[in-house]
Amino acid sequence: MSRKKTQPKKVVTPDPIFNSTIIPKLINSIMYDGKKVVAEKIVYEAIEKIKSKTKEEPINVFNEAINNIKPTVEVRSRRVGGATYQVPVEVKTKRAQALAIRWLVDASRKRKDKHMSDKIFNELYDAYEKKGSAVKKREDVHKMAESNKAFAHFRW
C-alpha cells in the first residue's frame, strides 16, 4: 500500500466557445506531437460542418453522438481456477466517456476521407444517426457482454 496522499483529479477547463468539458478531451485525443492548435482547428471545423448540415445546435448534436457511442457494459477478464472468463461489468460514466471519445477518434482515423475534419464530422454525424464504426464498436462490446452474461456471478 502506498503511503502517499491520493492526488486530486485534474479539473478539465471547459471549452471557451461551447462551454463543454467533452470537446477539450476530444481535442486532446486527436492531438499529435503537442500540436493542440491543429487539433482545435480540426474539431472546430467538424463542428461547423455539423452546424451547416443539421441546422441544429451543434453542441447538442455532438453530445447526442457521444451518448450514442458510450457503452453501458463491457467485459473484463477474470481468472478463476485456471480458466479465464470474460465477466460483464457496468462501465462508470467517466470511463464510458473516455471509451466513446477513443472509439470516435479511432473510427475517424480509419475513414477514407481526405481531411481529418471531414473524417471527424462524418463519424460524428453517423454516430448521431446511430450508425458508423464507433457505434458498431459499442454494439459489439454490448453483444460480447450479453453473450457472457452467464459469468456475471464472477463479478468482483
UniProtKB/Swiss-Prot annotation:
It comes from the Bacteria. Signal peptide: none annotated. Gene3D superfamilies: Ribosomal protein S7 domain (1.10.455.10). InterPro entries: Ribosomal_uS7, Ribosomal_uS7_bac/org-type, Ribosomal_uS7_CS, Ribosomal_uS7_dom, Ribosomal_uS7_dom_sf. One of its GO terms (molecular function) is rRNA binding. Pfam families: Ribosomal_S7. Part of the 30S ribosomal subunit. Contacts proteins S9 and S11. This is Small ribosomal subunit protein uS7. It comes from Pelagibacter ubique (strain HTCC1062). The gene is rpsG.
